[in-house]
Amino acid sequence: YRYVDDILILLNQEDLPTVKKAIVRDLKRLGLKTNDKNADGDISQGFEYLGYFLSSSGITVRNSSVLKVEQSLEELIIKMKKEPPEYTEWKLNLKITGFIYGGNKYGWMFFYSQISDTSLLFRLDDLIEKLLKRYGMDPSVRRKRFVRTYHEIRQALHSTSYVPNFDKYSIDDKRRVVSRVYKKDFSKADEHTVEDFFGKIISKEIRDIEKDIQAFS
């Protein structure tokens, strides 16, 4: 679970001193205090909130978060250079689309699904294309796209298969993933063994994928 302790208040400029004092006073009554990251300004200049940048032109991802995911994509592709294409495809696509597991949504695109700036997503898709070519990745890798992921999440999340919902995977689906991606023969393994191995795989993917949205505020 992710807890948010950021407070966003919209008010008239002339009310700022009074409201600011009232907030500090009320927090003290609760045994709380503000930290050094508080800021105020004119809303027309745009502002950052929970990893987003909101302005009159729309909602996008703040620059530092964009740079972080770009770096993460490049690091992953470099790391995958010597891996089989099936494993590369699996890792890269999970980073792009995220996934659903245990009723929870994981991934960068899920977290930033409220943006209106789709030009950023085209930029990320172009970056991946360039990185795959730069590092000589196997052309058989069928990578997914941020732009389509965005639209699937916003418009067809409960019916799409583009964004994996591992809660809907049958035991045979999980066997196929283990066989294709991890090259392990679980064709004769019992359900408990398959479920246990698959659960460990996804737990690791959750840890990896959550790194892209840590320290968002």
Residue ranges, per PLM feature:
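Glycine-rich, often proline-containing surface loops adjacent to acidic residues and nearby aromatics
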Residues: 1-4, 48, 101-108
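Polymerase palm active-site segment centered on the conserved acidic dipeptide of motif C
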Residues: 1-3, 9-85
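Active-site and adjacent loop segments of nucleotide-processing enzymes
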Residues: 55-217
